[in-house]
């Protein structure tokens, strides 16, 4: 009867909040829109891969929503960052646009934040297993994640349709990111594939309800 999680992420997308502070953060002084990567549910092993790449790419802005937001983790992220960054809890609207990285140190916003990205990185793939890929894919963007994804059918399916990409280390991450940043067609095609995958998978809830009704 299908997977009701697809219906759920579509519902979440419909209810996603407008987040003025994110819009402000994404404003660029030069009027050139940055390429935004949203790193959702990240762990230290993930951050060690995407933060150095972010440092080398001034055309990028980065939103990090760490899986754990305790003090030590936030401090370790800040210690790695060499570009202007700010925690959401300490952000001021008047200088948000000057920051290159926004650290989301509160829960409950991630599913609404993905809408502002062009690329998503989903954490957990270097630990026990990746977190929710569908929350990002529903917005039609390519989804990158570490090697531990095999327990998750939707991640395997995303890879199969060309909307998801598993990276195994710093080098494979760089190769895929270089492609997405330099080839607008690759970025658009993979994002479209991810979004279509979710759209084409919805309907399970209706199906289940119909079956219950028939019985």
PLM segments and residue spans:
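Nucleotide-activated sugar donor-binding and catalytic core shared by glycosyltransferases
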Residues: 1-215
């Amino acid at each position: 009867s299908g997977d009701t999680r697809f219906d759920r992420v579509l519902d979440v997308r419909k209810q996603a909040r407008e987040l003025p502070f994110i819009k402000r953060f994404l404003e660029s002084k030069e009027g050139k829109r940055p390429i935004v990567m949203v790193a959702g549910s990240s762990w230290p092993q993930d951050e060690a891969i995407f933060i150095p790449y972010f440092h080398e790419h001034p055309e990028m802005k980065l939103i990090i929503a760490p899986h754990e937001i305790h003090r030590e983790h936030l401090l370790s992220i800040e210690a790695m960052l060499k570009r202007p960054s700010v925690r959401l809890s300490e952000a001021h609207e008047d200088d948000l646009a000057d920051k290159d990285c926004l650290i989301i140190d509160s829960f409950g916003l991630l599913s609404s934040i993905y809408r502002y990205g062009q690329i998503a990185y989903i954490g957990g793939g270097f630990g026990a297993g990746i977190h929710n890929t569908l929350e990002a894919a529903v917005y039609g963007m390519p989804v990158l994640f570490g090697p531990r994804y095999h327990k998750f059918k939707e991640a395997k399916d995303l890879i199969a349709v060309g909307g998801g990409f598993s990276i195994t280390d710093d080098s494979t991450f760089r190769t895929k990111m270089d492609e997405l940043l330099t080839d607008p067609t690759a970025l658009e095609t993979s994002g479209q594939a991810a979004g279509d995958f979710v759209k084409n998978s919805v309907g399970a809830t209706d199906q289940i309800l119909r079956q219950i009704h028939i019985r």
